Swiss-Prot record:
Residues 290-368 form the B5 domain. One of its GO terms (cellular component) is phenylalanine-tRNA ligase complex. Belongs to the phenylalanyl-tRNA synthetase beta subunit family. Type 2 subfamily. It comes from Schizosaccharomyces pombe (strain 972 / ATCC 24843). One of its GO terms (molecular function) is ATP binding. It comes from the Eukaryota. SUPFAM superfamilies: Class II aaRS and biotin synthetases, Putative DNA-binding domain. One of its GO terms (biological process) is phenylalanyl-tRNA aminoacylation. This is Phenylalanine--tRNA ligase beta subunit. The gene is frs1. Tetramer of two alpha and two beta subunits. Its EC number is 6.1.1.20. Mg(2+) binds at D346, D352, E355, D356.
Length: 589
């Protein structure tokens, strides 16, 4: 859940009254949000810093990512104001999208807010809304990027193009020197704020740019705007550009940016649209589209799901508290037509309308009832049931379970285990830290790191993990597959090979899998071990585990165990000898 920090005085002013902390906490609770913190009495707050309220917002309520949206939603909920009716002014400019943008960011939208009256607090809220949208819905600008400009210094019509880096020259925001696009990545590689976005366009032969009629670069999404169109507290006309790889999220973002701050326009709730000309992909239209979306909601469903028996007129009246306009369906007496305003992008189904009805009615007002039928419980997946049995049996044998991170570094997954990259590991596209680069394809790195962090404990250390590893599998819909593995390690004064071997035999006994002593002379179901050279283990002290699931079939390699190689122990900073086993449990499901 995003946490929004609002100026306490400004929020209460917008709500029309002062609240005690307890009163406001109760209001938030009734609405379905949560007051996380009131900094009024925070000893760490500096005297020059105004008190603020930190409010946890549901992740899908993009209309509440700023003070203006929170105040508007609560005012409508308290019936202090009606749902705003947004008005589109005549369009005066256009944005033409070139076909080349399909190579990198194919969609764009724009809008203009006229006569906006900003002050320092409103300006900060405007910038904060962009940041919150970028961090949440926009997925750190990978899906959508927002640019805001002082329209008074720009000249339309505008074009959205994809140019070669060397063809781009402009002065970036908060800079004084002009730079060439070919130097952009180098220029911002050490920027704490912008370097995290460079990967989005780093491998593209063309960069997206928005140009005005004079061919001046207004924006180079998703990285930086131009200095010449920089907005300030004194800006009165704001041009908003939005570019995206996802058209649905593009429309949501442009609607949020315009509806939230159109309240400060000279004529409140008015927005000047922009004609988007995109003939190459059939996306020519006018943005923003502020027409309400109509849903059909079954009256019986709304009542039964909430445990109510309300007439349709009362349901319609209650839904107005949630900014929804409902009326009886003239063609079906059992349903309502519910009109959802453009800022309520979280409404996707009649179940969302049902939830809003429950909030408007008040969850505290719902009758306390018990289910009419006996409560049932879900049946566990077989792989989970098997994993739980394994956990218990290994723990009974005197081993302690650990739960390391699912992610690890590329080196930990390969080089530190003395393995080469086989391209089977699922890699993160833009990892934030070196420790979390890939999804582990073995449980061993996590187990070894756990021993490293506990190497000062009394020896021996006997720990295990039963969990999933992941592999790339391009034959599947999600192009990955999971396997449930068991991994255990013994670290002590001696290698403890016999301890690991004994644990393997104990697990196989528990799985009712017999040991086959001469697999070449037998077609029986069971398991056997064969000597193997594995670079992770000491030469001559390693064996592979094979399992024959059905009579007469070939054995399948399901695991490996042995004494860990000294170079592996050195990489993980271990000074004790150690042995480990790892087997794939999925064949027993």
């Amino acid at each position: 859940m995003p946490t929004i920090s609002c100026d306490k005085e400004e929020l209460y002013k917008a709500l029309g009254r002062e609240y005690t902390t307890q009163e406001f906490d109760e209001l938030c609770f009734q609405f379905g949000i949560e007051l996380d913190e009131d900094t009024t009495n925070d000893p760490e707050r500096s005297p020059s810093e105004r008190p603020s309220l930190k409010i946890d917002i549901p992740a899908n309520r993009y209309d509440m990512l700023c003070l203006e949206g929170i105040a508007q939603a609560l005012n409508v909920f308290n019936r202090r104001m009606a749902t705003p009716q947004y008005k589109l002014l005549p369009s005066t400019t256009s944005l033409t999208i070139s076909p080349e943008t399909s190579e990198i960011r194919p969609y764009a939208a724009a809008a203009i807010l006229r006569g906006v009256k900003l002050d320092p607090i409103r300006y900060q809220s405007f910038i904060a809304l962009q940041d919150k949208l970028h961090a949440n819905l926009c997925r750190n600008r990978t899906l959508v990027a927002i640019g805001t400009h002082d329209f008074s210094v720009m000249e339309g019509p505008f074009t959205y193009e994809a140019l070669k880096p060397e063809e781009i020259n402009f002065v970036p925001l908060n800079q004084t020197q002009e730079i060439n696009g070919s130097n952009l990545l180098e220029f911002y590689k050490d920027s704490k704020h912008l370097s995290r976005y460079l990967h989005i366009i780093a491998n593209s032969p063309r960069y997206p740019v928005i140009l005005d009629a004079k061919r001046r670069v207004c924006s180079l999404p998703p990285i930086i705007n131009s200095e010449f169109s920089k907005i300030s507290v004194d800006t009165r006309d704001i041009f908003i550009d939005v570019t995206a790889t996802d058209k649905t999220k593009l429309e949501i973002v442009v609607n949020m940016m315009t509806t939230m701050f159109s309240c400060y326009c000279e004529e409140p709730f008015t927005i000047e649209p922009v004609n988007i000309i995109s003939e190459h992909n059939g996306c020519t239209r006018v943005t923003p589209n502020l027409n309400p979306t109509c849903f059909k909601a079954d009256i019986d469903y709304l009542n039964e799901a909430c445990g109510l028996s309300l007439p349709e007129d009362e349901i319609c009246h209650l839904l107005t508290r949630m900014m929804l306009t409902a009326k009886p369906n003239p063609n079906d007496s059992k349903t309502l037509l519910v009109y959802v305003p453009p800022l309520r992008a979280d409404i996707l189904h009649q179940c969302d309308i049902m939830e809003d009805l429950g909030i408007a009615y008040g969850y505290d007002n719902l009758k306390h009832t018990y289910p009419a039928h006996s409560v049932t419980f879900g049946k566990p997946f077989e792989v989970n049931r098997l994993a739980d049995i394994i956990r218990n049996e290994v723990a009974y044998a005197g081993w302690s379970e650990v739960m390391p991170f699912i992610l690890c570094s590329h080196d930990e997954n390969y080089a530190w285990l003395r393995k080469t990259d086989d391209s089977k590991a699922v890699q993160l596209a833009n990892p934030k830290t070196l420790e979390f680069q890939v999804v582990r394809s073995s449980l061993l790195p996590g187990i070894l790191k756990t021993v490293r962090e506990n190497k000062n404990h009394a020896l021996p250390i006997k720990i295990f993990e039963v969990s999933d590893v992941a592999f790339c599998d391009y034959s599947r819909e999600r192009m990955t597959r999971n396997e449930r593995h068991l991994c255990a390690i013994f670290a002590g004064l001696n290698s403890g090979f016999e301890q690991i071997h004994g644990l393997l035999d104990r697990v196989m006994l528990m799985l009712n899998t017999k040991r086959i002593m001469n697999p070449k002379d037998s077609d029986a179901v069971g398991y056997w071990i064969e000597a193997e050279d594995d670079s992770t283990f000491f030469p001559g002290r390693c064996a592979a585990v094979y399992y024959r699931k059905d009579f007469g079939t070939a054995g399948i390699r399901v695991g490996v165990f042995g004494v860990l190689h000294p170079l592996v122990l050195e990489k993980f900073e271990l000074t004790s000898a150690a042995s480990a086993v790892e087997i794939d449990l999925t064949l027993w499901v």
